[in-house]
């Protein structure tokens, strides 16, 4: 009997020890997992922003997913308000894209304090969120004239920062260099599209896409080739290191024209087609203008 009691006590004690040990191991694993997650976030998201080392593949994929999700939800809200994604919608879209680019450049020159909300992607979330709120609010209040009200709101902010920008100009000729490249390649595309009857450029929004992406490619090329800047994004950086800086413009142009060709041929819904196109435009116009503004300010 005594032996059974001792054995029972030993068994209970052993069970308690095992449970305590398991809990301890779980806590260790949980703490280690949390620390690994923190290290991952710091390594791939925070550290590159703090040190200005450029973007990495993990960031590109993450921000791409966030952009796609935000775009989908925004599109659904627009359709509920019966707002069509057309040339009118593009007007405030362009204004706010320029605003993001100019503010980001003013962060680089030190006028705006550097923080998560004033650098990419934080500034895109901030101004992009304000743009979405502006469009939805003016859509409710002004109905079909929403785009005028939205553009005016964006212009008020833009004019203030533009005044600041004008006080920091050091390389005004950079605008001419970029403008010449954009003009040459844009009219070359229009000429070939018409002469060869490719029918790739079908609307003003298609023009905006080509011009926006050409501004990005041209500003990058001039910034690196003439003024000694470097490319932050890994894929363009690899291409320029492999094929040369000036090969980036025709390469990017081919990709954009192929994207437009596929969209115009395969996507029937005009609203879906146009919101994708405007997104492509903004992805070129925003970084392109930022690079150009930086170059002009000598930052």
From Swiss-Prot:
Pfam families in the record: DUF63
Subcellular locations according to the entry: Cell membrane
Membrane topology: Multi-pass membrane protein
Principal subcellular localisation of the protein: membrane
Bilayer-crossing regions: 54-74, 89-109, 122-142, 149-169, 172-192, 208-228, 243-263
InterPro entries the record matches: DUF63 (IPR002749)
UniProt keywords, alphabetically: Cell membrane, Membrane, Transmembrane, Transmembrane helix
GO CC annotation terms, alphabetical: plasma membrane
Entry coiled-coil feature ranges: none
Name of protein: Uncharacterized protein MJ0440
